[in-house]
Structure formats: structure tokens, C-alpha cells
Amino acid sequence: SSVANLEGRVMRYPRMDKEVLATYSKGVIASSGCPSGIIQTRLRLGQFDEALRAAGEFQDIFGKDNFFIELMDHGLPIETQVTGDLLTIAKKLNAPLLATNDSHYVHAEDAGAQDAMLCINSGSRLDDPDRFKFDGTGYYIKTAEEMRELFKDHPDACDNTLVIAERCNVMFDDHEDGAFMPKFPCP
């Protein structure tokens, strides 16, 4: 992500191409991504073959055991529209499923505070009908039970979150200042 932030910004968003991904792919576990990612975007545009090809390329880059087809459900039409195709891609590539949740706040009752923060960030008001806001619901850290209920038709997608957790073995050295971020020179 450092390369994406330092060298790959497109507008204000960090991005990296597949060559950079391949360079740093060793030991990385990846998923197909959210609705704004290339795979789901291609599916929404009716370009199934291109979505399948992109998923296959990611699987080649990260390895068959390290690339997961990601399922999300916030009640958004753009998510439900592509779920069937994502399942088909997973089957065609023999890729495991992964249940994820886009989390922007800790508890469900924090949604109002998040909404207010979005208004502060964009300089708009809560009563502005045209302001930026999240569509759908459930952008908080869900419990295992909530996720299993949401993805009850695909329990393996929830199981795979545990498979990934068990595979992650990261140790951080103690730092004097408590920070684990790289130090970048200030201009």
C-alpha cells in the first residue's frame, strides 16, 4: 500500500497496477474487492467474461489458495445484482468465497455519528437531501452471529474468514513511540 500511496494515486485514491501487485504478492492474501473494484464493475456492466478474466489474473498473481471471491451484503442493489455472477466466477475458478462487511464505525448505533462526520467532511448539512451519504445499512463491525445469519446460504464464506485469520501470523516489534508505521521524511 505504500507504493500505491506514494506512486500510484489516481486523483486522490491510491492505486496500483497488476505488475506492482505481482512484485509484492508473495505471502499476500487477496480478495476480489468491493463494488467499486474491477471485477464487480465489469459484472455490473454486463461484461462477465472480462470479470472472469480479471479474477483469473488475480488468482494467478496471488495463487489459488490466496485469492478469495468476496461477498458483501449491505442491502445495496449493486451488491445483490452481482452476487450470482460472483458465485459463478468462484465455481469456474474453484476459488473460495469470503464474507466481508464494509465497516466504517464500531457499533450499529454509531451510524448517526458517522453520518454527521460525512457532513463535516463534505461541508454539507444533515438536512441536505443531495449530500453524500451511505446507501444501505450495516456499516459497523458485525458479530460472527450477524455475519453467519447474513450469509447463511454460504457458510463457507464465513468459515474462510477464520481460515484467513489462522493463516495470519504477524508480530510487531515494540517501538518506543508505540507506532508501527514507516517513517517518511517530511518536506
What are the residue ranges of the model-derived segments?
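Phosphodiester-processing cores and adjacent nucleic acid-binding clamps
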Residues: 1-187
